[in-house]
């Protein structure tokens, strides 16, 4: 890899005595790359050096923009066409753009595919979260919404392990994305969300899925449980609005207005802290792989902490407490930056900050799902997730 200093070279001779500059800009061919950590990288292959070094950050921004757009459109697709169809579209975008990205001849094509990967990648979590919550009853909504975070952290750890053993970026790209193709098999293994089918009036399909699940669990259901009049009497059939809910509906009436503003700030602040600590984690120690592993591993205790305490202490107290802990830890870690004698303390404080940020990240998903009514819930999660990016 090359740093900014390697983009200059010494001038061999100075004919003009007035010239004080002793270096001149060099070309890509003049650079010597350090292969002690990686054998190849996109920085070298796509020439993200010197006056083109900004492209590396730009394509990172494109990925985040894709995630933001994906939050919005995938939520709409999920509500209109079904959870599983939205999930399969996400699988197609991530696997297709990820695999093709390893063979792109130029950096602009690669950047566009990273954008598509961001769109599809966000569908994985959002749609899967909704499916997990809708597959269980109210008693297990919180537990289901929190447990799903743990495989997310484990996936990050696996990616770090792959990167440690695979130092060629093309091979790593393929190893990380080819297994995603296996997720197409979920179409045949996981049925559509019965709650979504009920909400869209497809009662026969919902009944078939629920009865199959009851049979597997040795449960018996009443014969008329999915009759329209029974559902209406028992208030089990979700009300369907005449018009599709929009972003503006999040601010009607007054109670929803303040609730939405509050949650928008929660999502924004939590996400900024979470991703900021994640991106900065590679600079904690000299070994970037160990840094990444520590940053990912600390998320798991954060999620487990939420599982054990939220049922007893509620959402708002835990969210407030963890935000204070995370914020103070980050401020303290920043004040200790550059002090070699306190480097270990800075790392510990950074990890405590990531612990709190990860836990907050999980809580805001569950909290939003519980705060907003059914007809506007998916719109709220999708739009807040879009705004946070």
Residue ranges and their predicted role:
Residues 2-54, 215-284:
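Flexible cytoplasmic loops linking transmembrane helices in multi-pass membrane transporters
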Residues 82, 103-108, 120, 166-167, ...:
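Helix-breaking motifs and short loop linkers at transmembrane-helix boundaries and internal kinks
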Residues 85-100, 108, 150, 318-333:
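Structural signature of the two symmetry-related core transmembrane helices
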Residues 38-39, 44-48, 108-122, 179-181, ...:
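Hydrophobic core of transmembrane alpha-helices in multi-pass small-molecule transporters
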Residues 79-80, 102-105, 134-138, 164-168, ...:
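Membrane-helix boundary and inter-helical linker elements of multi-pass secondary transporters
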Residues 114, 149, 267-270, 278-389:
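C-terminal transmembrane bundle
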Residues 64-67, 121-126, 130-190, 292-295, ...:
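Glycine-rich segments within core transmembrane alpha-helices of 12-TM secondary carriers
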């Amino acid at each position: 890899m090359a740093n900014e200093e390697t983009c200059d070279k010494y001038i061999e001779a100075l004919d003009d005595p007035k010239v004080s500059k002793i270096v001149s800009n060099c070309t890509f061919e003049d650079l010597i790359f350090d292969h002690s950590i990686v054998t190849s990288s996109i920085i070298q292959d796509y020439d993200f050096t010197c006056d083109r070094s900004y492209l590396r950050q730009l394509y990172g921004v494109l990925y985040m923009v894709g995630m933001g757009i994906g939050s919005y459109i995938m939520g709409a697709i999920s509500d209109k066409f079904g959870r599983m169809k939205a999930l399969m579209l996400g699988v197609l975008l991530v696997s297709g753009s990820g695999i093709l990205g390893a063979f792109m001849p130029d950096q602009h094509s690669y950047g566009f595919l990273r954008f598509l990967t961001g769109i599809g990648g966000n569908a994985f979590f959002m749609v899967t979260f909704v499916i997990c919550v809708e597959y269980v009853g109210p008693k297990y909504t919180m537990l289901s919404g929190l447990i799903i975070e743990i495989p997310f952290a484990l996936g990050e750890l696996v990616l770090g392990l792959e990167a440690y053993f695979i130092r060629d970026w093309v091979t790593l790209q393929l190893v990380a994305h080819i297994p995603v193709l296996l997720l197409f098999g979920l179409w045949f293994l996981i049925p559509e969300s019965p709650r979504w089918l009920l909400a869209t009036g497809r009662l026969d399909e919902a009944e078939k899925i629920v009865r199959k699940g009851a049979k597997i669990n040795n449960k018996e259901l009443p014969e008329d449980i999915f009759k329209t009049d029974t559902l209406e009497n028992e208030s089990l059939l979700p009300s369907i609005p005449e018009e599709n809910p929009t972003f503006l509906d999040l601010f009607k009436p007054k109670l929803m207005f303040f609730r939405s503003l509050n949650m928008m700030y929660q999502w924004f602040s939590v996400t900024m802290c979470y991703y900021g600590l994640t991106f900065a984690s590679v600079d904690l120690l000299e070994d970037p792989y160990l840094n990444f592993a520590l940053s990912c591993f600390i998320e798991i205790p954060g999620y487990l902490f939420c599982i054990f305490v939220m049922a007893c202490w509620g959402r708002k107290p835990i969210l407030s407490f963890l935000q204070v802990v995370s914020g103070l830890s980050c401020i303290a870690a920043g004040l200790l930056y550059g002090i070699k004698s306190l480097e270990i303390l800075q790392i510990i404080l950074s990890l405590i900050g990531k612990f709190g940020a990860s836990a907050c990240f999980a809580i805001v998903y569950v909290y939003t799902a519980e705060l907003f009514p059914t007809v506007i819930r998916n719109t709220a999660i999708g739009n807040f997730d879009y705004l946070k990016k």
